[in-house]
């Protein structure tokens, strides 16, 4: 894909403060996009990327998202890398607060982003919405229920939203990571083979592909990485 394939296009990256979101925002900026990075708070100065404008919003707050989309330039693409994680625990130890938190962080956030993104993209006549699911939503073994079911919900959301926009110039897809090579994951799993883990820059290329103008026939896809 040409390095300037997003020149003149506005892209919103939700979760831009996280390891994945930071890398995805950087990839779009490098490809020529005008990027708005959204986080719950402003990133530290040394994490701010040149060419990325940073704003704050609570992605589980419908009103804050409405205000954000009203304030930013009409986007070509909306990228959602927001997410929380909860480890495996047996059902006998299911924590209702953890379940609620995971549904809020992963599914409610994705649903509200979809609501406002599709309104903006359909109003513009074309565009791309790309979510982030997880292999845990497909393969439940070894996954925490709260996390797994919330990511399964994201996969179903993408399928339903894609059906809704089918036949238009708007598409809805998702990237489905397994493990990602991040400092936090390395710290959590110090004895794993980190060299075999997918790297953020490589995963970011999947978002570029799904958000590209040339990917107009790709709708409802879940790309495993």
Predicted regions and their residues:
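Rossmann-fold scaffold of SDR-type NAD(P)-dependent oxidoreductases
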Residues: 14, 75-83, 106, 131, ...
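N-terminal Rossmann NAD(P)H-binding glycine-rich loop of SDR-like oxidoreductase domains
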Residues: 17, 25
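Catalytic Tyr-X3-Lys loop
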Residues: 92-111, 130, 154
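Active-site helix of classical SDR
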Residues: 114, 150
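C-terminal helical subdomain
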Residues: 167-170, 174-175, 182, 191-225
């Amino acid at each position: 894909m040409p390095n300037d394939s997003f020149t003149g296009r506005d892209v919103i990256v939700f979760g831009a403060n996280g390891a994945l979101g930071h890398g995805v925002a950087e990839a779009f900026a490098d490809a020529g996009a005008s990027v708005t990075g959204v986080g719950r708070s402003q990133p530290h100065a040394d994490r701010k990327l040149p060419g990325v404008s940073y704003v704050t919003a609570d992605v589980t707050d419908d009103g804050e998202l409405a205000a954000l989309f009203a304030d930013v330039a009409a986007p070509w693409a909306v990228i959602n890398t927001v997410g929380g994680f909860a480890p495996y625990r047996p059902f006998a130890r299911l924590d209702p607060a953890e379940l609620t938190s995971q549904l809020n962080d992963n599914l409610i956030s994705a649903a509200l982003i979809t609501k406002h993104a599709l309104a903006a993209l359909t109003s513009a006549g074309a565009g791309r919405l790309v979510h982030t699911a997880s292999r845990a939503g497909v393969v439940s073994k070894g996954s925490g229920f709260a996390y797994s079911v919330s990511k399964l919900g994201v996969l179903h959301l993408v399928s339903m939203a894609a059906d809704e926009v089918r036949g238009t110039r708007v598409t809805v897809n998702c990237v489905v990571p397994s493990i990602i090579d991040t400092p936090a994951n390395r710290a959590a799993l110090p004895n794993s083979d980190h060299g075999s883990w997918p790297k953020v820059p490589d995963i970011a290329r999947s978002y570029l592909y799904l958000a590209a103008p040339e990917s107009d026939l790709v709708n409802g896809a879940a790309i495993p990485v």
